[in-house]
Amino acid sequence: MPTAAGHRHIADRILDALPDANFPFADVASDSEYYDAIEFMYRKGYMTGTSETQFSPDSALTKAVLVQALYGMAGSPEVNTDNLSFADLDSSNPAFKAAVWAVSNGIVKASDGKFEPDSEISVADFGLTMIRFSAKVDFNLKRVVKTVSMSFSLALENKFMIIKRSITRAQSAQKLAGYRYY
């Protein structure tokens, strides 16, 4: 005769197998290798979709999305936006505060008064940005060393084609979610 605990175990396994009704992205399969990372980044508010129902996991990560994720991971600190502006990023844009924060902290660069929010992030730039983030904002020697290791791992995974190849939104979600656990 099954026990209450046995019924609970079966019910839990059934619920685990069902897709999360509150997870909005139809293009992220619940059995994909990056589902947990994307769900984590979404639930924490670090990354959003490209629309209400699409995450676009295979699309390239943009500079605006990366700085928004890092800004959120840093706790969304207060930012003085009075002294910095960008010709290509309006102050009403949701990425503006994150861009000012990231440039002010030396995590990413802006040039000639432009932030280039839609520029694609290469694997190499992602690794360097994460090293800067680890060293300047979230300093912990162990984390910095692990971030350097993660960057090298990214280079290996991409067969050292890191200068031209863009990192995808799914790959970045995996690396950023993993970073939180270092």
Role assignments for model-derived ranges:
Residues 38-41:
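Extracellular/surface recognition and adhesion modules
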Residues 1-21:
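Histidine-centered active-site loop/cap adjacent to the catalytic His
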Residues 19-33, 48-67, 71-97, 104-170, ...:
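Feature responds to low-complexity, polar/acidic, surface-exposed segments characteristic
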